[in-house]
């Protein structure tokens, strides 16, 4: 049997790794940001402490109830990034990852074709991107005040709740910190930026301008007039009117009969005088 390792390196490149290609993958086939890096470029920093993006976790391994939100301050208490802290920029429920401002940062070269405005030097710009940190490696920082009244941030633990609306903290007893001032405020949601007006968008003055006023002399008729006409000229109202009129007529006839019967009874009961039939 022929050894395939002697044939594949001619197409794949030197070495015994069959999956290592001689040429890098095209940009549209790359799946990780770090594949855009050129290690030979001195302008790109290679921070060994920075970790790549976290993999997608299974649904059973994902955090069911999140208690860390965008805008909170967190502290990395374990892992290679232990000791760093910052503000939460983004959360990812699929990877259980938290993006912290200024933590786990890596410099990445961005291709020009991905930018709307090309740079003047026609070179790929290098930007710093913060990568994710696992949810289990961080701890929330609560607001507190020292004995001198200065604001500080201290790491706290949370009580377990089966809801994201409840965030009860366990207040630690730290020397020099007023324990009654320890609190964990809910971060304020940032207002979403308004979309810029486009060239084909209808302006507000045009939308609010009154271009039609209802009139009874010109079509179309206003809604209230149509409703009145429909109510007054409907067949259902004609039937109701006839039914009421018949009831009224029957009532009047019954009253007349009662009056006639009463008058007849009174006439019968009335005594007859002797002069009534006199000649």
UniProtKB/Swiss-Prot annotation:
Q: Which InterPro entries did the record assign?
A: KOW, Rib_uL2_dom2, Ribosomal_uL24, Ribosomal_uL24_KOW, Translation_prot_SH3-like_sf
Q: Name one GO cellular component term.
A: mitochondrion
Show the CDD domains listed in the entry.
KOW_RPL26 (cd06089)
* Transit peptide per record: 1-31
For this UniProt entry, the molecular function terms from Gene Ontology, in alphabetical order, are:
RNA binding; structural constituent of ribosome
- Which Pfam families is this protein grouped with? Ribosomal_uL24m-like
Designated name of the protein: Large ribosomal subunit protein uL24m
Arranged from A to Z, the UniProt key words for this protein are: Mitochondrion, Ribonucleoprotein, Ribosomal protein, Transit peptide
Q: How does it assemble?
A: Component of the mitochondrial large ribosomal subunit (mt-LSU). Mature yeast 74S mitochondrial ribosomes consist of a small (37S) and a large (54S) subunit. The 37S small subunit contains a 15S ribosomal RNA (15S mt-rRNA) and at least 32 different proteins. The 54S large subunit contains a 21S rRNA (21S mt-rRNA) and at least 45 different proteins. uL24m forms the wall of the exit tunnel.
- KOW domain: which residues? 70-100
Could you tell me which residues belong to the region Disordered? 34-56, 185-204
Provide the coiled-coil residue spans: none
> Where is the major localization of this protein?
mitochondrion
Places the protein is found? Mitochondrion
Query: What is this protein's function?
Result: Component of the mitochondrial ribosome (mitoribosome), a dedicated translation machinery responsible for the synthesis of mitochondrial genome-encoded proteins, including at least some of the essential transmembrane subunits of the mitochondrial respiratory chain. The mitoribosomes are attached to the mitochondrial inner membrane and translation products are cotranslationally integrated into the membrane.
PANTHER family, from UniProt?
MITOCHONDRIAL RIBOSOMAL PROTEIN L24
Q: Which family does it belong to?
A: Belongs to the universal ribosomal protein uL24 family.
